[in-house]
C-alpha cells in the first residue's frame, strides 16, 4: 500500500501566502474601487407608515370568505352562533365604579401603583 500523505496535497503550503503581499490576485482585488451598496428606492411607498407586509390583504385572502362574503374563515358563523346567550355570570355591571383612591393615585404617575395602603 502506498503512503497517502504523498498523494494528498499539502494545503498549508499551497495557501501559505494567501491574502498577503505575495498573493497577486488578492492585491489586484484590493486596488479596485469599492462597490456602492444596493439601494432600494421607495421601499415603503405602497404600504406607507405602519402598514408593512399588508399589501392587498383583502384581495389575496378571498379564499377565506364564507358563503355570505364576510371576511373570516369559510362558513364563519361566530357572530350569530352565540346570539342571545350570555357568557357566564352576567351579574356584574358593565362599568366598574371609580376606585376610592383616584385622587391619590394621580400623583404617582400614569402607570404606577399607589402605595400599599391605598388599594
UniProtKB/Swiss-Prot annotation:
Q: Which GO terms describe its cellular component?
A: mRNA cap methyltransferase RNMT:RAMAC complex; mRNA capping enzyme complex; nucleus
Region Interaction with RNMT: which residues?
Answer: 1-55
List where the motif RNMT-activating domain lies: 36-42
> Which residues does this entry mark as bearing Omega-N-methylarginine?
85
Key word Transcription present? no
Q: List every stretch annotated Disordered.
A: 30-119
Task: Spell out the Low complexity composition-biased ranges.
Answer: 89-112
Q: Where is the composition biased (Polar residues)?
A: 47-61
| Gene Ontology molecular function | enzyme activator activity; RNA binding
The record's Pfam families line, in alphabetical order, gives: RAM
**What name does the UniProt record give this protein?**
RNA guanine-N7 methyltransferase activating subunit
Supply the source organism for this entry: Mus musculus
